[in-house]
Amino acid sequence: MFPMVTEFMNYGQQTVRAARYIGQGFMITLSHANRLPVTIQYPYEKLITSERFRGRIHFEFDKCIACEVCVRVCPIDLPVVDWKLENDIRKKRLLNYSIDFGICIFCGNCVEYCPTNCLSMTEEYELSTYDRHELNYNQIALGRLPMSIIDDYTIRTILNLPEIKT
């Protein structure tokens, strides 16, 4: 008789404990119910990137002096700088400049150490393509400024601010 009573008491304690755990889970679910959703509808909504976001590199051909500092500071020696020495004026003349974004790690060293500020980071991050050879940008492709997502009226922009707990 006594073992049956103790089993019944254990069953009651286990039932109470299970109900408490279910109640705790339900309270957590209810606490998240009044929060804004975290997900965005990507093609139609985009987050505004921070001002220090490291996206695609923008290149200004006229400012470049072909010093090759960008190649020396790049951890993977990525930028390809073709230049010709002008003997009459004893200066380098830039012929071609290209970066392969399929290999680039977007560290930003080239932008940081460029003495003439001809390189800058943009907010463009949509670089996907079906052919990897299309990711090799020459000076013409690097010179194009991307359209700002704030200016695009077809896309709803969402400001990504951290929540402040009060």
Curated annotation (Swiss-Prot):
Catalytic class of the enzyme: translocase
Binding site for [4Fe-4S] cluster 1: C64, C67, C70, C114
Span of domain 4Fe-4S ferredoxin-type: 55-84, 95-124
One Gene Ontology term, aspect cellular component: chloroplast thylakoid membrane
Keywords: 4Fe-4S, Chloroplast, Iron, Iron-sulfur, Membrane, Metal-binding, NAD, NADP, Plastid, Plastoquinone, Quinone, Repeat, Thylakoid, Translocase
Localization: Plastid, Chloroplast thylakoid membrane
Annotated GO MF terms: 4 iron, 4 sulfur cluster binding; iron ion binding; NADH dehydrogenase (ubiquinone) activity; quinone binding
Family: Belongs to the complex I 23 kDa subunit family.
Role according to the record: NDH shuttles electrons from NAD(P)H:plastoquinone, via FMN and iron-sulfur (Fe-S) centers, to quinones in the photosynthetic chain and possibly in a chloroplast respiratory chain. The immediate electron acceptor for the enzyme in this species is believed to be plastoquinone. Couples the redox reaction to proton translocation, and thus conserves the redox energy in a proton gradient.
Name the UniProt record assigns to this protein: NAD(P)H-quinone oxidoreductase subunit I, chloroplastic
The species this protein was found in: Raillardella argentea (Silky raillardella)
Lineage: Eukaryota, Viridiplantae, Streptophyta, Embryophyta, Tracheophyta
Designated gene of the protein: ndhI
